[in-house]
Amino acid sequence: MSEVTHSARGGVRTPRNAATTDADGKEPDPPEAAVPRRYRDAGSARYFVRRIGFYLVTTFLAITFNFLIPRFMPGDPAAALTRKITQLTGAPPTPNQVASIRRFYGDPSQGVLGQYLDYWTSLLHFDFGVSVSNFPVPVSTMIMQALPWTLLLIGSTTILAWVIGTFLGAYMGWKPGNRFDSIFAPLTTFAHAMPAFWLALIVLWIFAIRLKWLPISGAYDPNVPFQINNVWFVLSVLKYGALPAVTLVFIGFNGWLFSMRNVMVTTVTEDYVLLARAKGLSGAQVLLGYAARNALLPNVTGLALSIGGVIGGAILVETVFTYPGMGLLLQQAITAHDFPLMQTILLMLTFITIVANFVADMVYGLLDPRTREA
């Protein structure tokens, strides 16, 4: 007689000695364990190579589009910028500065291919021309001053919001309808509807203006030496970044909470979860090892897709708190009509989004083997 075995994840397994067929009379595909390891590894390698190729092409297209934007503008953008700099400063740019502007915005005496090669040369040398509003400061210098603050703010708050929202959503979906779920769900729904700038203004008014617990603007105390290995400087950064960070986390975690909760409500009724409970596993083992593990995958995918929205929220929050990141720099560039700075900031934000999506795609492929086999 054939022996029937049971699995906590899949219910009743196929009899070991019985030949099984599907509805069409064909033998089904062998399970993953029956596929030789070298074939599974080859499929995984192809998946990662395809994803790397996709994001390389995406980056190439984004850079090419950024190259074409000023070429579609009427007239000669480089000459217009040169005239504007002369009007603002009272002195014309130096020949080297004019050459830098020409490399980035085009030289009519060159063909498009020559301009494109010069553009790539400028990018590889991190040469984006000079800022119009802060002439003669190079755009790259301003980017390098603002980019670390934005990466610190966006990176820390995105991860923190994702972790908080995912864990709370898993707990609420594990026992839907309990007291915690009934009270917390309406509150988070209301919080999720708040615009980022409105919440930032409320937080600023309460904690910085009325209570005076935290600073109203800036990224660190100017009286503390700018040294990363200085404990007082680190504490100053945490103090000045607390209000922007709390605002972004409060805005961001609600989406992850509802996403995880909705998937968990469905997952807890799956057969493999019910069987795990029937086998006597503890609630924590079933929650973490079976239900939450499978419900987590949509949140991993959504993490990359949310980067664009997080950047948009960060721009508003940085502006409200005068936090010296890319958002505040973009607002200042728009106000001053500083096109070289605007164009470079948009390129950097696009690149950050692409990198975040790439990392999330790689993590998703490691968590779910089915994506590597598709």
Briefly describe each language-model feature range:
Residues 1-55, 176-177, 362-374:
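Transmembrane alpha-helical segments of polytopic membrane transport and secretion proteins
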Residues 3-5, 30, 36-44, 105-166:
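An internal, D/E-rich "acidic patch" concept
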Residues 35-40, 59-66, 71, 149, ...:
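Helix-terminus/capping and membrane-interface signal
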Residues 42-46, 143, 147-180, 196, ...:
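Alpha-helical transmembrane segments of integral membrane proteins
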Residues 44, 52, 97, 101, ...:
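Hydrophobic alpha-helical segments of integral membrane proteins
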Residues 57-65, 112, 116, 125, ...:
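Hydrophobic alpha-helical transmembrane segments of multi-pass integral membrane proteins
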Residues 59-115, 211-233:
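Hydrophobic alpha-helical transmembrane segments of membrane transport/permease proteins
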Residues 65-72, 118-121, 187-218, 247-249, ...:
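Membrane-water interface segments at the C-terminal ends of transmembrane alpha-helices
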